[in-house]
UniProtKB/Swiss-Prot annotation:
Annotated region (Beta-like import receptor binding (BIB) domain), positions in chain: 32-74
Protein name: Large ribosomal subunit protein uL23
NCBIfam families in the cross-refs: PRK14548.1, uL23_arch
GO CC, alphabetical: cytoplasm; cytosol; cytosolic large ribosomal subunit; cytosolic ribosome; extracellular exosome; nucleolus; nucleus
HAMAP family according to UniProt: Ribosomal_uL23_A (MF_01369_A)
Principal cellular location given in the protein's record: cytoplasm
Compositional bias segments (type: Basic and acidic residues): 1-19
Keywords, ordered alphabetically: Acetylation, Citrullination, Cytoplasm, Isopeptide bond, Methylation, Nucleus, Phosphoprotein, Ribonucleoprotein, Ribosomal protein, RNA-binding, rRNA-binding, Ubl conjugation
UniProt remark on domains: The N-terminal beta-like import receptor binding (BIB) domain mediates interaction with IPO5, IPO7, KPNB1 and TNPO1.
A Pfam family it matches: Ribosomal_L23
Gene encoding the protein: RPL23A
Post-translational modification: N-terminus is methylated by METTL11A/NTM1. Citrullinated by PADI4.
InterPro entries given in the database record: Nucleotide-bd_a/b_plait_sf, Ribosomal_uL23, Ribosomal_uL23-like, Ribosomal_uL23/eL15/eS24_sf, Ribosomal_uL23_CS, Ribosomal_uL23_N
């Protein structure tokens, strides 16, 4: 049995062939590479363009565990002050007086008093005593009585 003759791809119709030829002619005349206008540099300095900076993808964390917060609510407030002047503040100004950690700021003191004693704080004044301790004057909100709170805490 004789081998079958291979069928060649059907020849494209005349219109398609003509269009293809025109396209080729146009490409030869114009050139296939685009001609982009060259941007004129007006400055002698070259500013490198900002490129994409990908986020780091570390293979392992550099710290095995997050650091423990050493300044928690219980560490911030050391003890309430029970001197005569502190008692006068409680009675006259609706203010409690505490000795607090030197590193604590007013916001932290306010949050600690709120959490530990369940009271609202109007404002906090602080000073550092000559012996190096920090003293905090905690003014309570008008709807709380400092005398009652001091009684509950056990100052009086």
């Amino acid at each position: 049995m004789a081998p079958k003759a291979k069928k060649e791809a059907p020849a494209p119709p005349k219109a398609e062939a003509k269009a293809k030829a025109l396209k080729a002619k146009k490409a030869v005349l114009k050139g296939v590479h685009s001609h982009k206008k060259k941007k004129i540099r007006t400055s002698p300095t070259f500013r490198r363009p900002k490129t994409l900076r990908l986020r780091r993808q570390p293979k392992y964390p550099r710290k095995s565990a997050p650091r423990r917060n050493k300044l928690d609510h219980y560490a911030i407030i050391k003890f309430p002050l029970t001197t005569e002047s502190a008692m006068k503040k409680i009675e006259d100004n609706n203010t409690l007086v505490f000795i607090v950690d030197v590193k604590a700021n007013k916001h932290q003191i306010k949050q600690a008093v709120k959490k530990l004693y369940d009271i609202d704080v109007a404002k906090v004044n602080t000073l550092i005593r000559p012996d190096g301790e920090k003293k905090a004057y905690v003014r309570l909100a008008p709807d709380y009585d400092a005398l009652d709170v001091a009684n509950k805490i056990g100052i009086i």
